[in-house]
Regions:
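Ligand-binding loop in jelly-roll beta-barrel domains
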Residues: 81, 92-117
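Alpha/beta-hydrolase fold active-site loops
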Residues: 65
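Glycine-centered positions in the ABC transporter ATPase nucleotide-binding domain
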Residues: 72-73
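A short, N-terminal "cap"/entry segment at the start of jelly-roll beta-barrel domains
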Residues: 1-45
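Preference for bulky hydrophobic residues occupying beta-strand positions
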Residues: 47, 88, 108-109
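Structured binding elements
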Residues: 68
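Conserved short histidine dyad/triad with adjacent acidic residue
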Residues: 28-33, 38-62, 76, 80-81, ...
Length: 118
């Protein structure tokens, strides 16, 4: 359905926010997360990891796994390096601890995010 068909304006059917206007939550030294507006059962987020920093704990995934896009910089997972423009899918039940030597911005989402996040 388009905004015109409903008789309302486009602003009534969407939310548009500059990413950097969303307050960042520091989850560890040099690691920041922004939670974006999203529908039920989907958690959408942006993570920034500053140069030389590592996620503060091991990130464990449930039965849906985790999907992310490296927006800028370089993500390091184990011995693998992922540059901007790389899509990464972590399988259900997987775990990882991301880090970056150059700094990185990630856009990701978790489907069916029934657990609480801190």
């Amino acid at each position: 359905m388009s905004a015109g068909a409903s008789g309302g304006s486009i602003s009534e059917i969407l939310t548009a926010i500059p990413i950097d206007d969303i307050p960042a939550v520091e989850v560890g030294n040099g690691c920041y997360r922004r939670d974006l507006p999203s529908g039920a059962d989907v958690r959408v987020w942006v993570v920034d990891i500053l140069p030389g920093c590592e996620w503060p704990n091991v990130d464990q995934h449930d039965k849906a796994g985790e999907e992310l896009l490296v927006v800028s910089g370089e993500l390091i997972e184990g011995e693998q390096r992922f540059e901007a423009g790389t899509y990464v899918y972590f399988l259900p039940g997987s775990s990882h601890r991301p880090r970056s030597e150059k700094g990185v911005r990630l856009f990701g989402f978790n489907v069916s995010a029934a657990r609480t996040y801190s």
